[in-house]
Amino acid sequence: MADSLVVVTGASSGIGLALARAFSKDGHALLLIARHMKPVDGLPAERTAYAEADVADYAALERAIRGAEAKFGKTACLINSAGLADAREFKQVEPSAFAHEIDVNLKGVLNGTKAVLADMSARGSGTIFNISSVSDRKTAPVAVTYTATKYGVRALSESLREAEGKNGVRVINVAPGYIRTNIHAGMGITFEEYKQALGNPDFLTAEELADIILYCWRLPPHICIRDIAITPTRTTF
């Protein structure tokens, strides 16, 4: 299964887990990475590898990817899906909290990309999806660090696309709106409290987003959807 490996970070829950299921169903070998990664029910063991690693730790991330490549072949697709959000006003956020958010949301994307990009470029093929947010183009009075990191992810995606498109590498920025995940748990609130704080908008499911990303992946290699914003119809954000 050379050149068929799909690497997903943040794969233990939410969008990452939905992506793992969608790409596995499509027949791909997988490396699923998260800080607390356990085997996923229903995924074939013979073509699924797991690694517990912090995306902010480049050495750990690279080791995990090289190990999976030794078994399944070179990485054909990387999906940088790990992320977190602190919705508090910035004056309430501790420096350690915003530093961690930057480590996961931006440094993690840089680390994952660095681990696979040189080989993709040399081969003349490969796809990198960076899961950003509609917050990468719209500011807000809360979640300031989150917004700043997502602006960075979008700029990184476009810069890499300009640098590597000529080498056959697709870089796709994915900017979801409200997606039903467990991101609220990290804020210490229930989903209903989270939804109310946002003004009770509609939410898409992680599975719906995963299907859209899989569609982008399936397009012929000479077609690159550079930047895609995906939101519920009934939302103003």
Where does each model-flagged region fall?
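Conserved glycine-rich Rossmann-like NAD(P)H-binding loop of the short-chain dehydrogenase/reductase
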Residues: 26-42
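Substrate-binding pocket helix/loop in short-chain dehydrogenase/reductase
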Residues: 89-90, 94-102
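Conserved glycine-rich cofactor-binding loop
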Residues: 12-13
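Residue(s) in the substrate-gating loop at a strand-loop-helix junction
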Residues: 133
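Active-site helix of classical SDR
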Residues: 113, 149
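Active-site-adjacent segment of SDR/Rossmann-fold oxidoreductases
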Residues: 138, 159-169
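C-terminal helical subdomain
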Residues: 169, 173-174, 194-236
